[in-house]
A protein has these predicted regions:
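Alpha-helix-loop-beta-strand connector modules within alpha/beta enzyme cores
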Residues: 8-32, 80-93, 138-154
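Active-site mouth loops of central-metabolism enzymes
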Residues: 34-49, 68-70, 95-107, 153-161
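Hydrophobic alpha-helical hairpins/lids featuring a short glycine-rich hinge
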Residues: 44-87
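Conserved small/polar residues in nucleotide/adenosyl-binding loops
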Residues: 192-194
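Glycine-rich, proline-tolerant flexible connector loops at the mouths of alpha/beta enzymes
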Residues: 1-18, 36-41, 68-76, 99, ...
Length: 194
């Protein structure tokens, strides 16, 4: 949404914004969310466009690419992962968390193994709607820590009011990183505060 907001609403160049941030914080790794073959847009793009966009992102200062497909179809993230790795940057394979009768702990573990097999540098559990329960998070992360070797990140929104406890249980299970926000921009639809 950053690229879309810059162009559509602010009449700004998103690349210029990125360069300014990198200049102001040269030692801070810059991260972006990449929707696999959708990049930062709302349709699928060709492999050539995906490659050029990632190369341009690297050139302008992105270090870590959090790559996902909304339907967890890894065919839609594979090319992005390959190009990020080819450019010497961090590819974070991401699972878009949801709840259904088929989404068991083992379903998520199997998907995480496939993500690790893509040569991702880390895994992110992306709970964009805040529906990951504390106990499911504990069970899932405990099992993932036994089954995969790459670092595990948790991104969960405060939408449902469970995220504080969910993050606490994730830490108890051994998660490597949790995403947080500064207090003035936290909670509600955002992340928990530091």
């Amino acid at each position: 949404a950053i690229f879309d907001s810059c162009v559509r609403y602010l009449d700004e160049d998103p690349w210029e914004r990125l360069r300014e941030l990198k200049k102001a914080m040269p030692k801070t790794k810059q991260q972006m969310l990449l929707r696999g073959q959708n990049l930062v847009g709302y349709k699928h793009y060709s492999d050539e466009i995906v490659s050029k966009f990632i190369e341009k992102s690297v050139l302008n200062g992105i270090d870590i690419f959090r790559i996902f497909d909304a339907l967890n179809d890894l065919r839609n993230i594979k090319h992005s992962v390959d190009i990020v790795k080819k450019n010497g940057k961090h590819a974070q394979g991401t699972m878009a968390y949801t709840i259904s009768p088929v989404h068991t702990v083992q379903t998520w573990v199997d998907l995480a193994k496939e993500i690790e097999d893509l040569d991702c540098d880390s895994l992110c559990i992306k709970d964009m709607s805040g529906i990951l329960s504390p106990e499911f998070a504990y069970d899932l992360i405990s099992k993932l820590k036994k089954e995969i070797s790459i670092p595990i990140h948790l991104h969960t929104h405060a939408t449902t009011g469970m995220s504080n406890l969910t993050n606490m249980r994730a830490v108890e299970a051994g998660v490597d990183n949790i995403d947080t926000s500064i207090s003035s921009m936290s909670m509600g639809l955002s992340l928990i505060h530091i």
